[in-house]
């Protein structure tokens, strides 16, 4: 996807919100709208982009594979959906923005923040004390809220669900942080350690939120009270429902549509033409079953196509110190979902078995 696309999608709505804000405080100093926008906008855009790239990875072999339409996060767009998939998009995008802001803060990209040393010197546990340079997640969380949550201008149930899932994403960044330590002592005895907290790899956050997606909770609400909009009756119904929701639990309102079939109005492309996996090294069971999930169970057949690819081969090490490779062409068998023929299949098309039941 072009960088300009996600820049517009992830920031355009926020820019307007910030321009209308009188001012907001960051680390005890005041920044007015346009200046604040320019300071953090590139990090927000990069964070939103990394979130969507992770979404595409996590759902690469699912019927819904995080298409470009999933980037439309704000509730004033024409989709207004609150499905299980939408909950993940909000969470992973929010996490991506917070993650990037936190990382860039630790790298010294912003004058307004640095390491989190608030606990330095305190005893953390047996044989170790807090010290070093912990990643400043509080800063990342605060600025992420100001940007990402500003996209949510509604006050109905869907808006509250989106804000909740935004928060789930931010909490995921905190929940996956790692403790890193450095040993101190005579002759490397490591009699005491100095430790700090650092961000996990973003893939770990994606894996964490994918589990939350699988365990997401559907909210059952009275549709008549929901249609009341921002009335006292609607707010009461929403508050009552959210009272039983855990802060780290993804929630959704509507059942997912049939992602097997194309629906242009909803931005769903269907699974026809999608690649699937049948063989290969280090494939998970989920990946090995992708042909059944994407093709067979969607009423499509698996079609094998042979594609020519160019790859490095016959690599040799030369003293000193380079590796030289040849460029080899080879035919690789790939598998795609295709429509079933109404007549007998031509001889050149190989039908594949449907795979094992899950």
Q: Could you say what each language-model-derived stretch is?
A:
Residues 1-12:
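Classical eukaryotic N-terminal signal peptides for Sec-dependent ER targeting/secretion
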Residues 13-358:
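Long, position-biased, composition-driven segments near the start of the mature protein
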